[in-house]
């Protein structure tokens, strides 16, 4: 939540070569869109209606409207399909699972335990007192967690588009919806209890779930999701993480296109 379109710029190296027409847009509150200071707007329901407004403005229909959402955008894509799938040709959910509680469990009981025990102990000490903005805490996350599970590229080699996109995140929106921790969604974050596992079978449009071996999300659950919808398939990126469109481009775009 709160991120802009810039980290999708990797698509420009692949889609035009296949004559695929595609559109980015910045959600309300992020870089190129207005940023009204109205907390009540930052809800799934609002953003679903925003997608529908964009679709109408572009004149897209069920004959040509393929929606791709990554991470939080995957949540949004699923919710859009549950309300407006008659307007969709197909849905692509990239690097997102259908349950935030399950994501929290995976982050804390699988990925966190892969860290060096002393590093994890120090990270947990800051989380215990909710000191999520501490420079040492952030440094530990960026040094030990991000390079394994967010983007498997050395930090000093991160693409400029990704660096700029992360730098321009609207943090009030991010904190309201996602929360301050990188190990799941915690506190009063509005997405904390989001779970549509029981509704996946309502989705009838062609559905592609994209997951990655080293993702912050459980690739097993992302594959499971593809089997729960009526017409789903799964694309696995064996070398990728949460930003597989950057760190496993060969598999990501070969499977997507």
Feature map (PLM): residue ranges:
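Catalytic histidine-centered segment of alpha/beta-hydrolase-like enzymes
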Residues: 237-253
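Conserved HGGG/HGGXW glycine-rich cap/lid loop of the alpha/beta-hydrolase fold
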Residues: 1-40, 54-55
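Conserved acidic catalytic loop of the alpha/beta-hydrolase fold
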Residues: 45-64
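Alpha/beta-hydrolase
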Residues: 121-198, 205
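Short beta-strand/loop motif that positions the catalytic acidic residue
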Residues: 203, 209-211
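Conserved alpha/beta-hydrolase "acid-adjacent" motif
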Residues: 216-221
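Conserved hydrolase catalytic core segment
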Residues: 61-107
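Flexible "cap/lid" loop of the alpha/beta hydrolase fold
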Residues: 91-133
């Amino acid at each position: 939540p709160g991120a802009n379109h810039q980290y999708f710029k990797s698509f420009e190296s692949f889609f035009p070569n296949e004559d695929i027409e595609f559109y980015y847009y910045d959600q309300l509150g992020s870089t190129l869109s207005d940023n009204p200071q109205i907390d009540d707007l930052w809800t799934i329901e609002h953003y679903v209606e925003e997608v529908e407004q964009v679709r109408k403005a572009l004149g897209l229909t069920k004959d040509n409207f393929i929606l791709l959402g990554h991470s939080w955008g995957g949540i949004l894509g699923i919710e859009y399909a549950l309300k407006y799938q008659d307007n969709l040709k197909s849905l692509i959910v990239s690097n997102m699972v259908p349950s935030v509680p399950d994501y929290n469990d995976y982050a804390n009981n699988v990925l966190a335990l892969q860290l060096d025990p002393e590093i994890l102990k120090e990270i947990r000490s800051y989380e215990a007192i909710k000191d999520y903005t501490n420079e040492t805490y952030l440094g530990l996350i960026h040094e030990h967690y991000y390079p394994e599970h967010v983007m498997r590229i050395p930090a000093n080699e991160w693409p400029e588009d990704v660096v700029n996109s992360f730098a321009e995140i609207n943090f009030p929106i991010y904190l309201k919806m996602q929360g301050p921790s990188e190990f799941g969604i915690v506190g009063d974050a509005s997405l904390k209890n989001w779970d549509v596992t029981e509704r996946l079978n309502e989705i009838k449009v062609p559905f592609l779930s994209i997951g990655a071996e080293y993702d912050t999300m459980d690739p097993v659950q992302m594959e499971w999701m593809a089997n729960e919808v009526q017409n789903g398939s799964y694309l696995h990126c064996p070398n990728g993480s949460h930003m597989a469109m950057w760190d496993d481009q060969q598999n990501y775009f070969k499977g997507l296109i």
